[in-house]
From Swiss-Prot:
Gene Ontology BP, a term: isopentenyl diphosphate biosynthetic process, methylerythritol 4-phosphate pathway
Protein's recorded name: 4-hydroxy-3-methylbut-2-en-1-yl diphosphate synthase (flavodoxin)
Amino acids binding [4Fe-4S] cluster: 270, 273, 305, 312
Lineage, top ranks: Bacteria, Pseudomonadati, Pseudomonadota, Gammaproteobacteria, Enterobacterales
Pathway membership: Isoprenoid biosynthesis; isopentenyl diphosphate biosynthesis via DXP pathway; isopentenyl diphosphate from 1-deoxy-D-xylulose 5-phosphate: step 5/6
Length: 372
């Protein structure tokens, strides 16, 4: 609907996490991490399936002990989304989850033991075609780097990352991605900018420990939005002290806002004033909840009066412009009907679902024609 030039993405190599491609122009993936006890298999499986339902491409699971590794085996058997095992310090856990079919190992080669143990894990990953994520965090920098720089700096995070990269380079292992996360937006952004100039591997974006649902979403939107708008980033996680499902929703909202990747409805709604002719806020809140199952990309504008309503409707898939007792409904920029203000939510839900079905069918026909 809008004619801005697409963002030019940084060129990177491609890896696969399970069957999900990352890097080299592949769609930017959205992931989250479980916050259950991994040894509670039922709770962890239920949370992973909830994340799948809202669109998670990849899910990370912490595996801190061998008991958790045994639980991971059972979890992996019950879910279809690719799983990343988050492992620190004990190389044996990495070898065990590799045996159980893990799709990616999140490790820092430098903290799982001596050179021989690193080699064992990397050789196992190579043999089983399992990629590795190097995850550098400002809160856990190596002691010598803390002493050298005095505090976490972009240069310190970069140096830490390159140490781990060098471990893999020495072992001729190229199937990896890297993250350099910090809770400070500017520190994280500059660290990623430096790293993007140093390596060709895919970058996993995140503002770590960003905060609660509201403040964390704001920090993540600013930090990830800056990087993504510069073409940096191949996969992302929004880290929130909240239900992990919210991380996926915010992640997709960031991508939708930048018109990088669309999933579901992009609601455009006015903040309301005394000119509104129907309850805009109540309508939007209700529709966001009722239509969470819609994954068809579409823009829906809900504007309470005729000041900005018609203009927004012209560039929306569906648009409502508030009017006296009845409001105008636009479809693909053309006024089609009038909706009763007293029954706005039900009428709009019905129209949106019908439009989503129409768009899905049109795409299905297009795919069939291409396949012919």
């Amino acid at each position: 609907m809008h004619n801005q030039a697409p963002i030019q993405r940084r060129k990177s190599t491609r890896i696969y996490v399970g069957n999900v491609p990352i890097g080299d122009g592949a769609p930017i993936t959205v992931q989250s991490m479980t916050n259950t006890r991994t040894t509670d298999v039922e709770a962890t499986v239920n949370q992973i399936k909830a994340l799948e339902r809202v669109g998670a491409d990849i899910v990370r699971v912490s595996v801190p002990t061998m008991d958790a590794a045994e639980a991971f085996k059972l979890i992996k058997q019950q879910v279809s989304v690719p799983l990343v095992a988050d492992i620190h310090f004990d190389y044996r856990i990495a070898l065990k989850v590799a045996e159980y079919g893990v799709d990616c190992l999140r490790i820092n080669p430098g903290n799982i033991g001596n050179e021989e143990r690193i080699r064992m894990v990397v050789d196992c990953a190579r043999d089983k075609n399992i990629p590795i994520r190097i995850g550098v965090n400002a809160g856990s920098l190596e002691k010598d780097l803390q002493e050298k720089y005095g505090e976490p700096t972009p240069q310190a995070l970069l140096e830490s990352a390159m140490r781990h990269v060098d471990h893999l380079d020495r072992l001729n292992f190229e199937q990896f991605k890297v993250s350099v996360k910090a809770s400070d937006v500017f520190l994280a952004v500059e660290s990623y900018r430096l790293l993007a100039k140093q390596i060709d591997q895919p970058l996993h974006l995140g503002i770590t420990e960003a905060g609660g649902a509201r403040s964390g979403a704001v920090k993540s939107a600013i930090g990830l939005g800056l990087l993504l708008s510069e073409g940096i980033g191949d996969t992302l996680r929004v880290s929130l002290a909240a239900d992990p499902v919210e991380e996926i929703k915010v992640g997709f909202d960031i991508l939708k806002s930048l018109r990088i990747r669309a999933r579901g409805i992009n609601f455009i709604a006015c903040p309301t004033c005394s000119r509104q002719e129907f309850d805009v806020i109540g309508t939007v809140n209700a529709l966001e909840q009722r239509l969470e199952d819609i994954i068809t990309p579409m823009d829906v504008s809900i504007i309470g009066c005729v000041v900005n309503g018609p203009g927004e409707a012209l560039v929306s898939t569906l648009g409502v412009t508030g009017g006296n007792k009845k409001s105008g409904l636009y479809e693909d920029g053309v006024r089609k009907d009038r909706l009763d203000n007293d029954d706005m939510i039900a009428q709009l839900e019905s129209r949106i679902r019908a439009k989503a079905s129409q768009l899905d069918e049109a795409r299905r026909i297009d795919v069939l024609q291409v396949e012919k």
